[in-house]
């Protein structure tokens, strides 16, 4: 699972996830990509589960790039703890996803296999996604 090696601050405010992705919106490394249509948060576990599903399906063929990184800590207070007494401890990390963001890329496999692999990966993710092909010269 991915997580930052170290962070400047242990905890972050919740914030808002507005707008559409302008950076990371094109297929840059591979030939095919899995692009987010919806918005939301992906936990490090979900990112890893989708990666495993794709890797198992393509069986050593091709190469996969993960274009997102879970860099936002999410804190939780323990169960049955009274309100107050500060913010809870960081429990896991998430990546904030806007519509248009390319999540994964793949190369070295044919399109049919890539579509099947991305469909398996998309089933592991809580947001809507679509299959995209790299645009030549653009």
UniProtKB/Swiss-Prot annotation:
Give residue spans, biased composition: Basic residues. 7-17
Q: What's this protein's family per the entry?
A: Belongs to the universal ribosomal protein uL16 family.
Q: What does the UniProt record say this protein does? A: Binds 23S rRNA and is also seen to make contacts with the A and possibly P site tRNAs.
Q: Quaternary structure per UniProt?
A: Part of the 50S ribosomal subunit.
What organism does the record attribute this protein to? Nitrosospira multiformis (strain ATCC 25196 / NCIMB 11849 / C 71)
Name of this protein: Large ribosomal subunit protein uL16
- Entry's Gene Ontology BP terms: translation
Identify the taxonomic lineage of the organism of origin. Bacteria, Pseudomonadati, Pseudomonadota, Betaproteobacteria, Nitrosomonadales
A Gene Ontology MF term for this entry?
tRNA binding
Region Disordered: start-end pairs: 1-22
Q: Which GO terms describe its cellular component?
A: cytosolic large ribosomal subunit
């Amino acid at each position: 699972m991915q997580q930052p090696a170290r962070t400047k601050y242990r905890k972050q405010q919740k914030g808002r996830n507005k707008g559409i992705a302008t950076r990371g919106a094109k297929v840059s490394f591979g030939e095919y990509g899995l692009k987010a249509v919806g918005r939301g948060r992906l936990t490090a576990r979900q990112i890893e589960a989708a990666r495993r599903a794709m890797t198992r399906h393509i069986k050593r063929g091709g190469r996969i790039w993960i274009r997102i990184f879970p860099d936002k800590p999410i804190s939780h207070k323990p169960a049955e703890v009274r309100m107050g007494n500060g913010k809870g401890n960081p429990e896991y990390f998430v990546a904030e996803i806007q519509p248009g963001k390319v999540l994964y890329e793949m190369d070295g496999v044919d399109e049919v296999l890539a579509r099947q692999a991305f469909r398996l990966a998309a089933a592991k993710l809580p947001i809507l996604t679509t299959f995209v092909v790299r645009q030549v010269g653009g």
